[in-house]
UniProtKB/Swiss-Prot annotation:
Enzyme class per UniProt: hydrolase
Family: Belongs to the Maf family. YceF subfamily.
Organism: Photorhabdus laumondii subsp. laumondii (strain DSM 15139 / CIP 105565 / TT01) (Photorhabdus luminescens subsp. laumondii)
Active site: D69 (proton acceptor)
Cofactors named for this entry: a divalent metal cation
HAMAP family in UniProt: Maf
Annotated SUPFAM superfamilies: ITPase-like
Function (record text): Nucleoside triphosphate pyrophosphatase that hydrolyzes 7-methyl-GTP (m(7)GTP). May have a dual role in cell division arrest and in preventing the incorporation of modified nucleotides into cellular nucleic acids.
Name listed for the protein in its UniProt record: 7-methyl-GTP pyrophosphatase
Cellular localization per UniProt: Cytoplasm
GO process terms (BP): nucleotide metabolic process
Reaction(s) catalysed (UniProt annotation): N(7)-methyl-GTP + H2O = N(7)-methyl-GMP + diphosphate + H(+)
Pfam families attached to this UniProt entry: Maf
Length: 196
């Protein structure tokens, strides 16, 4: 079986990929994530997912390399990780009572053949109306400053929502496993038959 590389240092993506029970290693892609002018959310995450996967091709020349990127769109504005309490508070205040759409790009690059397959998965999060004290309490309790959208849906963040809509709940955490499984099977790696 071709060795798998996850082009990410994200603990969340690593934990998600472990669900497939395939051996893999993680490597930092060191990719410039600056958005381009007039680039929409879908174009941005697909470009960055592919760039992350291909960034490691010299070091890993006979591998399947997975790249992923995620942004959220709140009221038509592309946002990413808040990195500060103030930005996180602003993001959650903007999301309050609205639908926030997460765009997650996933790319599988076969560095041996040069074949790349890149997709974008959408996931909608409908927030309930949030009071400022609820937002402060949540941010203090969970400190989600390294998470797109300023929450962790796998934790206390679930209390912020009215409902969730999407094909794969793993997409919201950063790695759409249903789509990734499809891409892996197309490259000859089936997680079910690889269990051994």
């Amino acid at each position: 079986m071709t060795q798998i590389i996850l082009a990410s240092t994200s603990a969340y993506r690593r934990m998600l990929l472990e669900k497939l029970r395939l051996p893999f290693i993680c490597a930092a892609p060191n990719t410039d994530e600056t958005p381009r002018m007039n680039e929409n959310a879908e174009q941005l995450v697909m470009r960055l997912a592919q760039a992350k996967a291909q960034a490691l091709q010299t070091k890993y020349s006979q591998h399947l390399i997975i790249g992923s990127d995620q942004v959220c769109v709140i009221n038509g504005e592309i946002t990413g990780k808040p990195h500060s309490f103030e930005h996180a508070f602003k993001q959650l205040r903007q999301a309050s009572g609205h639908c926030v759409t997460f765009y997650t790009g996933i790319s599988l690059f076969n560095s041996k053949t040069g074949i790349t397959d890149t997709r974008c998965e959408l996931f909608n999060v409908y927030f309930r109306e949030l009071a400022d004290d609820e937002i402060r309490a949540y941010l203090t309790a969970e400190n989600p400053l390294n998470c797109a959208g300023s929450f962790k849906s796998e934790g206390l963040g679930i209390t912020l929502f009215e409902r969730l809509e999407g094909k794969d709940p793993n997409t919201l955490i950063g790695l759409p496993l249903i789509t990734l499984t499809e891409l892996l099977i197309r490259q000859g790696v089936n997680p079910l038959t690889a269990i051994g």
